[in-house]
């Protein structure tokens, strides 16, 4: 009898342990998936980080998708997102000139103007943040009327007619939530001495980063040449990125693409507040 009770008690303890592990594992898995989705989905919501960079003296003109559709053949859509975003899904016939190129590459700006011709220019990104910066830059140099689709993705996806002007997937980045997640690291025991800050504007880091060298690299605002030169300057130690905002966390995915294109890898990211 006592043997049976001991066996049952042992079985109960083991079962409880497995159940606890399953629950903890499930919570961790959910947290990882939720975090990945937040990182990717962040570009569908406007960010104060971009608005701080906008020139208040250089206003832009917002336009509705309904106005574009009504005069479709007289508009050209300039998609200022990253190539991976553009290749995943885009407005039909749109041109892809990423924001960093338009901000820093005069040849890219002139090529875009030449391709657009006499058509009215509409700058597009999912939320209107990057497109606002691009439109402001182009208007200051070339003049003309440059439109921005404010929350353009939402306008398109909420209307059956507008969706016919979209081609490809509605996922923001390749792989969606199934994309292999970049490891999230802790400062304790971290041997890398250099961390990459991907935020749009540099700001002092929290005290837990004391003793680390912080390199500011806002890749969404950098040209292709600037990004490649920066990556070429990195040493041989693991590449670790800081994720301290929606935009910088989103940028970790883009940074990872660029590293992989250069035969490197993003070893991990550290979240700070």
Regions found by a protein language model. Name each.
Residues 2-65, 71-75, 83-120, 126-193, ...:
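Rhodanese-like catalytic fold shared by cysteine-dependent sulfurtransferases
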